[in-house]
Amino acid sequence: LQQSLVQHTPGNIASLQDESRLARIVFSLSTIAVLTKIFGFAEKFVIAHFFGTSDTADVYFASTGIILSIIWLVRELMYPSLLPVFADSLSKSASASGNLFRKAFLSAAGFLAVAALVLIFFCGHLTKLLLPGFSESKRLVTVNLLRMLSPAVFFLGLTMVTYTTLNARKKFLKAAFPEAVLKLFIVLGLIALLPVLGIYALAVVMGLGGLGCLLAQLYFIPEHKSLTKQDNDKNGTEYFKNVLLLMGPLVVGVIFSRISGLVDNLLASMLPSGQLSYLGYSKKLIDAILLIGPVALVTVIYSQLSHLASAKEYEKFTSLISKTFRLLIYLSVPVACLLIGLNQPIIRVLFQRGEFTADSTFGTSRAFMIYAFGLITFSLEVLFVHSFFALKDTKTPVTYGILCVFLDITLAIALLKPLGFLGIAGAFVISKTAKIIILGAILNKRCAGLFDLKIVPYLIKLSATTCVLLLSLRFLLGINNPDSLINTFAFDLMLPGIGALLVFAGCSYLLRIDEFKALVSLLRYRRAAISTLYEEAK
């Protein structure tokens, strides 16, 4: 790196320094994301140990599904609309950014207060509407839990505003770290309180943890001082109007995206007890994998894409999307193959203890396998949607997102009777795949040269490498071993998983796949593939 700096001009040196900084951020953010998902998934371990796939586990997934729908509604509205506008306001004046933050924060607080009141006073009607298949006893527990979770909705919803603001200020680590601490607090709190309070312990720890996370993120935002001031800065008002203009087209699409998950739970509530939990455990595991890799990468890339689009550097914009696309494909294809091939050992090692029985493992692993088929789709969806957002185009992904939600619901209803919970999972994967095909085609038209013929040799190399991985995985899975948890971990999971990945890495090296070099750079030097993505440091 020192030799490279000597050989480059001052302008290139600055570029290298920016790339190195982004690389360190990606690595650190991925590390925190890993810890966050470990702590977050430890919550599922605790629930699995105490409740397995019983009625109480169904209540847990149904209740958190409703709560998180409200919280993520705020995030999905705020992140693509507030982030680029707040970033612009920082270059104007401190009063403009402060006024914008105040208006966004208080507006979200008003919405969340109404949502919390609805949970308190109309929860009974809500559960009858959203969970019609629940028995009276399950519905009563769900109602009580949702009412107790209303403060958590308010606090955690507001953290979506502070999280977005910190990302707009490029304080990625300060945005992510409090969330990791929150997840750890929830896990420790559940372990301590579940034996005493039962499932209602969830409301206590989420409420207290949400308040702590909000206060921590507010501390790192200089504009938090504006919350107690009445500032009539006209620029701040105009910026807030721009946020609302960007948010407007998102509202219907985001609501429909939340409806999709709620309808899945609605349909699953009419199936035999435990099948809603099968979907819940498996979907959360896929989400954890996505957040550790693709989402962490795209979170940083999105900020850079927004700046490139604002500066009208469309050639670099297209190049960054193209190279990120290739990297995501390279990461997700082998991981998807491993998840599909090792679905039962993964679920058994992670969950099968306490109240989580062998039957629970069998059902959850089947749902997990279906979701694993969609890992590539889910990874690319994050990139494509955020690419449109960086271009300040929220209408296109929202429009096709709505159409795909209708497709998801239609397929889920059609497949429910013949396939049960597997039909719900399959419908979700099919609809998401249709969405990324459409968005990819539109993005390719807007960004000339995005998916040109240069990608064909790469796809051929990747296909050949993947075939070798599948053959090696099949061979290693054929090794017989005694049926115990330790042997399952060693011979059914680690041996075939690591062995197949080593074969994949070796083939990538022999075929000189560039994305393999980027990953080696990440592991050896803690420099993520940013330099490789830009190719400016050569």
Which ranges hold each PLM region?
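Membrane-embedded alpha-helical bundles of multi-pass transporters/translocases
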Residues: Q2-K538
